[in-house]
C-alpha cells in the first residue's frame, strides 16, 4: 500500500518533514482497484496538514504514477483521467442504484508503465446522456467492462454471466485490480446474490447504494 520510505517521499513532496507516527488501516484490499492506495496517500497528506486538492493530486502522481479523485469534492460524480490526474467532465447526477460485488481474480497494484487499456473515449461522450436513466448507465458501464475484460482478462471472468442470471441491469469492473460489481435498481437485489458471488469465486462481498438522480 505505502511503505515507510514511500511515505517519507510523499511527505517531502508535500512540503512536509518525514517525521511523526502514522497508522493506516484499510477496509479494502490493496491492488483491488477500489482506490485503497490513493486513499492511503490522501489520508497521510491530510494528517500532515495538507488539504489543497491540486497539491495532493500532484503528490499522488509523483508517488505511484496515477491517482483517484478522492481529494476532490464529490469524486464519484466526475469523469476522471487517473494517469494525468485531471477532471474530464462533470456529468449530471447518476440515477440511484444498488451495487453488489466484491473481488475476483488476482489483485493487481497500479503500474504507471501499464498502458494496456481499451479506448473508451466514445463512452466519455455518451455518459451525460446515459445519466438520464439507470438502464442507460448500466449499459454503458457494462460495455466498458466488456472491453476491459476482452483486452486484459481473465478469460473466465464470471461477472457478465452472473449479471444475466440474477437479473442485474448491468455490471461494472475496475479497469485495474480485481473489483467487480452488479448493477441493480434499488431494492431489487436477489437474496441469493451474495451466496452466488461467493460460489463464483468472489471475495470480500460488498453491497452499497450510490447516485442521487431520478
What do the predicted segments below correspond to?
Residues 22-25, 39-49, 161-167:
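Long, contiguous secondary-structure blocks with strong helical propensity
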Residues 54-171, 183-214:
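ATP-dependent small-molecule kinase catalytic core of the GHMP/sugar-kinase superfamily
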Amino acid at each position: 500500500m505505502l511503505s515507510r520510505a514511500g511515505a517519507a517521499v510523499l511527505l517531502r513532496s508535500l512540503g512536509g518533514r518525514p517525521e511523526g507516527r502514522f497508522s493506516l488501516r484499510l477496509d479494502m484490499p490493496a491492488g483491488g482497484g477500489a482506490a485503497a492506495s490513493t486513499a492511503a496517500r490522501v489520508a497521510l497528506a491530510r494528517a500532515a496538514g495538507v488539504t489543497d486538492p491540486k497539491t495532493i493530486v500532484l503528490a499522488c502522481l509523483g508517488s505511484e504514477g496515477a491517482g483517484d479523485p478522492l481529494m476532490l469534492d464529490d469524486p464519484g460524480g466526475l469523469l476522471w483521467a487517473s494517469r494525468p490526474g485531471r477532471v474530464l467532465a462533470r456529468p449530471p447526477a447518476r440515477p440511484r442504484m444498488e451495487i453488489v460485488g466484491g473481488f475476483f481474480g488476482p489483485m493487481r497494484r497500479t503500474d504507471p508503465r501499464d498502458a494496456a487499456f481499451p479506448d473508451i473515449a466514445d463512452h466519455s461522450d455518451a455518459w451525460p446522456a446515459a445519466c438520464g436513466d439507470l438502464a442507460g448507465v448500466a449499459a454503458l458501464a457494462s460495455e466498458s467492462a466488456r472491453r476491459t475484460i476482452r483486452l486484459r482478462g481473465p478469460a473466465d471472468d464470471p461477472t457478465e454471466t452472473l449479471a444475466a442470471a440474477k437479473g442485474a441491469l448491468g455490471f461494472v469492473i475496475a479497469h485495474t485490480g480485481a473489483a467487480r460489481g452488479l448493477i441493480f435498481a434499488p431494492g431489487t437485489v436477489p437474496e441469493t446474490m451474495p451466496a452466488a458471488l461467493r460460489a463464483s469465486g468472489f471475495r470480500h462481498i460488498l453491497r452499497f447504494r450510490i447516485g442521487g438522480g431520478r
